[in-house]
């Protein structure tokens, strides 16, 4: 039976329409990342393309990396800990084609070093997938003095993108234009970007900080589309879905118990491979060739929150704010001491 909270929200998924309407928990009929690859004829069919993924060694990162590797292209898997990365990704690593890149997006020095290392190995980058993240953690500052959720979910990725921007632009071709994909979250509903106090000094609350950072991820890709879409570089953001991963490690146990006990959550939840499907749709879906400035969920563009629905689905009105997006871009450049 279709879930009434989401049935009015679901659009056309083609062969998966019924699967998304009749959700039945992890491993149900909803597509995996590899299913999306097959549907788009991307299996072993992109040998001339280069991909870079952050947050590769845990959660949906492993499955996203597995799918990118299955394209036959060159894949750089960003990991904070090389030893952990070797263990987690052993099945897909392939010397000279699928390799690790030491990268901690919570450290701007690490981001700069990783970008320099990448550029010493490749003059090409077709898709950048910013997947690394943390959620609802206690207040903390990074080594650079930034609020940790902002730095890890957004600011480190913005810096990485800026350092690779010209490579993304020069790698774009008429048959496959370059893409930047930011993994956001339904958590963006929790807050717009607090532009006048982006580090939330004196007003920190874990979920507000998460919303602040995840909306920033959406704004970033919207602004990429505004600035560079006409030049063959596109930005897309997405909600992967409800997936049980270490991302939830800071969430109060009682809250987790409450989430897990609801029938909606049990049926809405996805496996990591299913969660990575929307990321791969954004990164490689043919329907998004030459397009961007959108927020996806369940492998399609998200609509507004349905009447009577939950914050688990749909996109908040504040996710699209051209004036705010420009201000955030300029503020981010200033925070990182970058010029345009």
UniProtKB/Swiss-Prot annotation:
Keyword NADP attached: yes
GO MF term set: oxidoreductase activity
Keyword Transferase part of the UniProt annotation: no
EC number: 1.1.99.-
Record: residues binding NADP(+): 60, 84, 104, 131, 162, 210, 214
TM regions (residue ranges): none
Similarity remark: Belongs to the short-chain dehydrogenases/reductases (SDR) family.
Name listed for the protein in its UniProt record: Short-chain dehydrogenase/reductase prx1
Organism: Penicillium roqueforti (strain FM164)
SUPFAM superfamilies for the chain: NAD(P)-binding Rossmann-fold domains
Key words, A-Z: NADP, Oxidoreductase
Family annotation (InterPro entries): NAD(P)-bd_dom_sf, SDR_fam
Mutant phenotype after disruption: Reduces the production of PR-toxin and leads to a large increase in mycophenolic acid production.
Pathway noted in the entry: Sesquiterpene biosynthesis
Signal peptide: none
Active site, UniProt feature: 184 (proton donor), 210 (proton acceptor), 214 (lowers pka of active site tyr)
Function: Short-chain dehydrogenase/reductase; part of the gene cluster that mediates the biosynthesis of PR-toxin, a bicyclic sesquiterpene belonging to the eremophilane class and acting as a mycotoxin. The first step of the pathway is catalyzed by the aristolochene synthase which performs the cyclization of trans,trans-farnesyl diphosphate (FPP) to the bicyclic sesquiterpene aristolochene. Following the formation of aristolochene, the non-oxygenated aristolochene is converted to the trioxygenated intermediate eremofortin B, via 7-epi-neopetasone.
Source lineage: Eukaryota, Fungi, Dikarya, Ascomycota, Pezizomycotina
């Amino acid at each position: 039976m279709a879930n009434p909270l989401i049935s009015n929200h679901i659009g056309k998924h083609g062969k998966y329409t019924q699967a998304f309407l009749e959700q039945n928990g992890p491993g149900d009929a909803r597509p995996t990342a590899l299913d999306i690859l097959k549907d788009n004829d991307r299996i072993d069919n992109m040998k001339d393309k280069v991909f870079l993924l952050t947050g590769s060694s845990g959660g949906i990162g492993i499955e996203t990396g597995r799918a990118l590797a299955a394209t036959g292209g060159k894949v750089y898997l960003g990991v904070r800990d090389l030893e952990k990365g070797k263990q987690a990704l052993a099945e897909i690593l392939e010397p000279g084609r699928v390799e690790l890149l030491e990268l901690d997006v919570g450290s701007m020095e690490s981001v700069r070093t990783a970008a320099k290392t990448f550029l010493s190995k490749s003059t090409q980058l077709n898709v950048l997938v910013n997947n690394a993240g943390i959620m609802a953690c206690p207040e903390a500052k990074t080594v650079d003095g930034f609020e940790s959720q902002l730095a890890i979910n957004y600011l480190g990725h913005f810096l990485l993108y800026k350092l690779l921007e010209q490579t993304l632009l020069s790698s774009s071709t008429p048959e496959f234009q370059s893409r930047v994909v930011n993994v956001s979250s339904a958590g963006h509903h929790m807050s717009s970007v607090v532009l006048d106090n982006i580090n939330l000094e004196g007003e920190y609350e874990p979920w507000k900080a998460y919303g602040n950072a995840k909306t920033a991820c959406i704004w970033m890709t919207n602004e990429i589309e505004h600035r560079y879409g006409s030049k063959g570089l596109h930005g897309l953001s997405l909600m992967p879905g409800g997936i049980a991963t270490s991302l939830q490690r800071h969430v109060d146990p009682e809250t987790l118990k409450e989430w897990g006990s609801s029938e909606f959550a049990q049926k809405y939840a996805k496996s990591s491979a299913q969660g990575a499907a929307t990321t791969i749709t954004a990164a490689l879906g043919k329907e998004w060739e030459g397009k961007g400035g959108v927020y996806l969920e369940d492998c399609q563009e998200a609509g507004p929150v349905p009447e009577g629905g939950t914050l688990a689905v749909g996109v908040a009105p504040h996710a699209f704010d051209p004036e705010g997006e420009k201000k955030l871009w300029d503020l981010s450049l200033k925070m990182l001491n970058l010029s345009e």
